């Protein structure tokens, strides 16, 4: 399956498939960990990470979905910062228009992505690239995404992940290493050792899971 065939076209120009929305809560991962945010979790992801914590390891056919208008989504927002996650947000052709619509309300927007797909989102939007090519070789990171990313977050499950991506990491872009949650008794010590060897990088610990908030 190529990237072009995976892009989901909107039912209307101002709508998009949504799995769930929630907030205010805190961002638990990456550069903005601890910030108060609202989440818009878009439906759908073909990447198939085996440890996916949002239900898409098998493609997510059982997950809830609803086509929502931008205006309805914006009415629900309560925080100054909005995180658009998934699933994989960049499979949706309507993503750039959604980001623009939220931006017109004066809110900051961050987008979480595997980087396998590309849409030209506004320059002011924050893009968190969490590459998954090492577990899904059929979905390599789009080269444009390495140049566009505002931060890179690498999930550490076996320890070799950093070696896979280190040559692609853009100079000056914040990089965080995040231990895979389900095996954290093993992956947290492993991640700490990697950080000692690469002290320019930072630790991401999925703070929301430790605090047991959405």
UniProtKB/Swiss-Prot annotation:
GO molecular function: 4 iron, 4 sulfur cluster binding; carbon-nitrogen lyase activity; magnesium ion binding; S-adenosyl-L-methionine binding
Gene3D superfamilies per UniProt: Aldolase class I
GO biological process: queuosine biosynthetic process
Role description: Catalyzes the complex heterocyclic radical-mediated conversion of 6-carboxy-5,6,7,8-tetrahydropterin (CPH4) to 7-carboxy-7-deazaguanine (CDG), a step common to the biosynthetic pathways of all 7-deazapurine-containing compounds.
Family annotation (PROSITE patterns): RADICAL_SAM
Cofactor, free-text remark: Binds 1 [4Fe-4S] cluster. The cluster is coordinated with 3 cysteines and an exchangeable S-adenosyl-L-methionine.
Enzyme class label: lyase
Keywords of the record: 4Fe-4S, Iron, Iron-sulfur, Lyase, Magnesium, Metal-binding, Queuosine biosynthesis, S-adenosyl-L-methionine
Required cofactor names: [4Fe-4S] cluster; S-adenosyl-L-methionine; Mg(2+)
Binding site for S-adenosyl-L-methionine: 87, 130-132
Sequence positions that bind [4Fe-4S] cluster: 45, 49, 52
The protein's name: 7-carboxy-7-deazaguanine synthase
Pathway(s) served: Purine metabolism; 7-cyano-7-deazaguanine biosynthesis
Top-rank taxon: Bacteria
Keyword flag Signal: no
Pfam families according to UniProt: Radical_SAM
Enzyme Commission numbers on file: 4.3.99.3
Oligomeric form and interacting partners: Homodimer.
Family: Belongs to the radical SAM superfamily. 7-carboxy-7-deazaguanine synthase family.
Protein residues bound to substrate: 26-28, 41, 85, 214
């Amino acid at each position: 399956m190529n990237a072009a065939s995976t892009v989901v076209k909107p039912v209307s120009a101002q709508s998009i498939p949504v799995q769930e929305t929630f907030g205010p809560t805190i961002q638990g991962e990456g550069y903005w960990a601890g910030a108060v945010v609202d989440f818009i979790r878009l439906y759908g992801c073909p990447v198939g990470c085996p440890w996916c914590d949002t239900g898409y390891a098998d493609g997510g056919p059982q997950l809830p979905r609803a086509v929502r208008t931008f205006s309805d989504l914006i009415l629900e927002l309560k925080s100054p910062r909005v995180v658009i996650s998934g699933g994989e947000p960049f499979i949706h052709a309507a993503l750039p228009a959604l980001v623009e619509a939220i931006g017109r309300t004066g809110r900051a927007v961050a987008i979480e992505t595997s980087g396998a797909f590309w849409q030209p989102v506004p320059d002011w939007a924050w893009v968190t690239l969490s590459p998954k090519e090492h577990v899904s070789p059929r979905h390599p990171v789009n080269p444009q995404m390495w140049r566009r990313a505002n931060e890179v977050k690498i999930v550490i499950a076996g320890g070799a992940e950093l070696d896979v991506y280190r040559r692609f990491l853009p100079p000056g872009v914040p990089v965080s290493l995040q231990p895979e949650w389900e095996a954290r008794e093993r992956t947290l010590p492993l991640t700490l050792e990697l950080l000692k060897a690469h002290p320019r990088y930072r630790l991401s610990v999925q703070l929301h899971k430790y605090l047991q908030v959405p």
